[in-house]
Regions:
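Membrane-proximal helix-turn-helix segments that form the acceptor-binding/catalytic region
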Residues: 95-104, 138-161
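Short His-centered aromatic/hydrophobic patch
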Residues: 91-94, 112-117
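Glycosyltransferase donor-sugar binding loop
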Residues: 35-43, 206, 233-246
Length: 248
């Protein structure tokens, strides 16, 4: 039985992490599956993971970006500097531990789930190992981000995109490389037994309620739309740092 390794930043709450767990649960039916995880944020994956999937934690460190920014905001310079140095050491450990895993694993297939992993996998992955990048984000006209993805994945065998439009976009960008782009949509854990009739005038958004997700922008946009279409409602489902702000 062939072995698949999936490189993961952590197994906490997040869309990428949910997709990683769903993929691992599917692949373990036919492969040995190991998730190589940089950070151990919780005692176990927050999403239900098949017992056949092995999780290997590469470090004992945890990210400290939040603490660093909090001290900066409060102008506690010494503590911010201390957290900054701690963060730099953490980035060094993260890079070295991930590269060591890539070079030493006996896996036949390695799947990267972040652009930083894409680059390291392309540079340090062993000959004969199938190297796959899995891009979850849309570049949203940010060509710096898109070009970074192209640079990071140019030495991989495949780049998996979650939409047809992204597949077409990156296929053109990677045309002069050996990296082939393929479209594979995200996995559904379970197919719903009952389908929506789609007759209600409701807008529904589900996700982590954090600043980068743009829920305040969504709410502002809905306030404009609702003036012209007052019978439509907006349901925001989720939890996170901006929940209280959204509720108020």
């Amino acid at each position: 039985m062939k072995k698949v390794s999936i490189l993961s930043l952590h197994l906490g709450y997040g869309g990428i992490e949910k997709s990683i767990v769903a993929l691992a649960n599917l692949l373990c039916e036919s492969y040995k599956v190991e998730i190589a995880c940089v950070y151990k944020l919780y005692d176990k994956s927050v999403f239900k993971l098949d017992r056949r999937v092995k999780v290997k934690y590469l470090t004992k460190i945890k990210p400290n970006k939040k603490e660093f920014h909090e001290y900066l905001k409060k102008k506690k310079i010494f503590k911010a500097l201390k957290e900054g140095l701690k963060g730099l050491k953490g980035l060094y450990i993260r890079k070295n531990s991930t590269i060591n895993y890539i070079e030493s694993t006996d896996s036949d297939i390695i799947i990267s789930t972040r652009d930083i992993f894409d680059e390291w996998l392309g540079k340090f992955g062993n000959d004969g190992v199938l190297k796959i990048g899995w891009e979850h984000n849309h570049y949203h006209d940010d060509m710096r981000y898109a070009n970074e993805i192209v640079r990071a994945t140019s030495k991989l065998d495949y780049l998996v995109l979650v939409s047809e439009s992204l597949k077409e976009f990156y296929s053109k960008k990677l045309a002069n490389t050996n990296c082939k782009c393929v479209y594979i949509p995200n996995i559904l854990d379970n197919m719903p037994k009952k389908m929506s009739s789609l007759t209600e005038k409701r807008l529904v958004s589900v996700g982590r309620l954090s600043k980068e997700k743009g829920y305040m922008d969504l709410l502002a946009l809905y306030n404009i739309i609702s003036k012209e279409y007052p019978t439509w409602s907006l349901d925001i489902i989720g939890d996170g740092a901006e929940r209280e702000k959204l509720e108020n």
